[in-house]
Amino acid sequence: DWVYAKDTYDAFSKQHPELLPPGITDPQIALFETPLGEIVRLFSFILKGDARGAMNCVKILTRIDDVRELVEQKSPQAKYLYKRFKEVNREYQSLLKSGCAAAKKQDSLLLFSYTDDTISLTSDLSNELLHRFPDKTIIVCREKSGEMKCSLRSATLLLPPLVQQSLAGLEGYGGGHEHACGSVVKTHNFDEFIRRIRKQI
């Protein structure tokens, strides 16, 4: 589901080459291997957590005049947003390290789960894990309130039918794009859900 819009890339790179070096045509490279990627994660991470805190960050974000103000933390507003970003990023980097460690060389499925009642990072984690392990099917799950909330990614498999077939008869639901899906399944059905997915990949 990565999109490369050449005109947009070229215009942004021309204006901000320090964030997006010229010549990059792969959206994954732009997102995970350039300074621009940190800005993208900042936008994602400041919206995590409770709604009041997220809306406060959005309000502050409207007072930022230029991306350089944000990157260089030139104002109190930019410093506040970066402080919030760093708080979430510490947790993200710790989970990412654990997710990478969960990858097994001979296993085509990278399954990683964690427990957190406050912040959902499954989508962000599954995207980066797919970038790092493009030959694997990625499933990142967060356990909360008796459910496993999952983000699934694959560079090659069509995920919606795979998810629907794996959920048949179980307490859960899911769907999404061709190569990026979400699903929620009760914890007591989770092992069976994963067993069915393994049979299809």
What kind of feature is each model-predicted range?
Residues D1-K105, T115-D116, R132:
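A structured phosphate/pyrophosphate-recognition subdomain
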Residues A11-E18, S108-I201:
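Glycine-rich, acidic loop segments that terminate in or are immediately followed by a histidine
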